[in-house]
Amino acid sequence: VQPQQPMGGYYQPRSNNAAAFGAGINGYLGYVKENPMNILKIVGAFFVFLATLIPWAHATYWGVTEHWNLFKAGGFNRFIAIIVLLLSLVLIAWEVADFIPVPQIANVKAKLQAIPYFEFILLGVIFVFVLIATIRHGYAHSDGTTINFREYGIKVGISAGVIFAYLGVIAAAAPRVLDKLGIKIGNK
């Protein structure tokens, strides 16, 4: 009687994981050497990720939960914060997809890359949500700043979370924009 193979093929031991991980790190370093601006992509993604967490940690520590973070800015912003958090994870995964030994992530990335300007759309969506958070924060607190466009005024409130998120989006977008414009920074 033949011994049964387990279904789903979960059985193969992955002995080359450490080697693949090392190769992945070398691959990533090569990617950064090729264009030093590439490091900004992942730094930016981390900033967006931290935008929802650092201010929350700070606020929890000081016992102030309203002002600081995307989760609480403007009352019920948890929805925005969670979306921004998830999208930042997508951005991080996007950057490491080519360098980690997980074919599923690489496959998904390949499919998404077929969508023109997918990365810009992703960053744009994050930007819009952060903008909404900024405006909601402005209206939720008396110290919001009013910015006037002709006769229309709009109140915005700057919180640490929002600043982190904007910095992250700008950092993640910069190399992509330069790339699209064909501007190369670094030793080519």
Labelled PLM ranges:
Residues 1-5:
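Cys/His-rich metal-coordination motifs, chiefly Zn-binding "fingers/knuckles"
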Residues 8-188:
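Compact integral membrane and secretory-pathway proteins
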